[in-house]
Amino acid sequence: MIAKTVAVLALAGSAAAYAPTMSLSANRRELVQGAAAAAVVAPLLRPTGASARDAQLRAPIVEIFDARGCDAKNAQYTGPKSNDMNDDQCVKVSMQKITVSEATAAKKLQEFIGGKATAINVPIISSMTKKY
């Protein structure tokens, strides 16, 4: 994006350096040249989309292990011990693929669009509107 901005500023600077300062009126040739320059620069000024999406549809998963008072062997952490209560606690962060079944996606879509599937004891407000 910075390179595009620099290119546009360089183009504008070069056009300003060679602009005829003595003539006050623009003729047809100058208008066509200006339109051509604008047509070249216009695609460079388009905003680019965000590219933060993970290609494999993975998301960070945070797992907290608290084994204080538990007699089981702690196998999640393999680093050096601190010889206090932190030896029985561990936080694990991993990137895992997130999958959703097509049936669940269809149910959610129906819920968002038409209010068909809702939770238990939740009134459906889409059918409560008065029809005049």
UniProtKB/Swiss-Prot annotation:
Q: Name one GO cellular component term.
A: chloroplast thylakoid membrane
Q: Name one Pfam family in it.
A: Phycoerythr_ab
Q: How would you describe the post-translational modification of this protein?
A: Contains two phycocyanobilin chromophores, one mesobiliverdin chromophore and one 15,16-dihydrobiliverdin chromophore with binding mediated by both the alpha and beta subunits.
Q: Which UniProt keywords apply?
A: Bile pigment, Chloroplast, Chromophore, Electron transport, Membrane, Photosynthesis, Plastid, Thylakoid, Transport
The cross-references to Gene3D superfamilies, in alphabetical order and at most eight, read: Phycoerythrin alpha chain (3.90.510.10)
Q: Name one GO biological process term.
A: photosynthesis
Positions that bind (2R,3E)-phycocyanobilin 2 = 68
Q: Name where it mostly resides.
A: plastid
Where in the cell?
Plastid, Chloroplast thylakoid membrane
What positions does the entry give for (2R,3E)-phycocyanobilin 1 binding? 54
Q: What membrane topology is annotated for this entry? A: Peripheral membrane protein
Sites binding 15,16-dihydrobiliverdin sit at: 123, 125
Q: Which domain of life is it from?
A: Eukaryota
User: Where along the chain is mesobiliverdin bound?
Assistant: 70, 76-77, 92
Q: What does this protein do?
A: Light-harvesting photosynthetic tetrapyrrole chromophore-protein from the phycobiliprotein complex.
Family that this chain belongs to? Belongs to the phycoerythrin family.
Q: How does it assemble?
A: Heterotetramer of 2 different alpha chains and 2 identical beta chains which form 2 alpha-beta heterodimers within the heterotetramer.
What further fact does the record state?
The light-harvesting system in Cryptophytes contains phycobiliprotein complexes. Unusually they are composed of either phycoerythrin (CPE) or phycocyanin (CPC) but never allophycocyanin (APC), with only one type of biliprotein being present in any one species. Unlike cyanobacteria or red algae these proteins are not arranged into higher-order phycobilisome complexes, and they are found in the thylakoid lumen.
Q: Which named protein is this?
A: Phycocyanin PC645 alpha-1 subunit
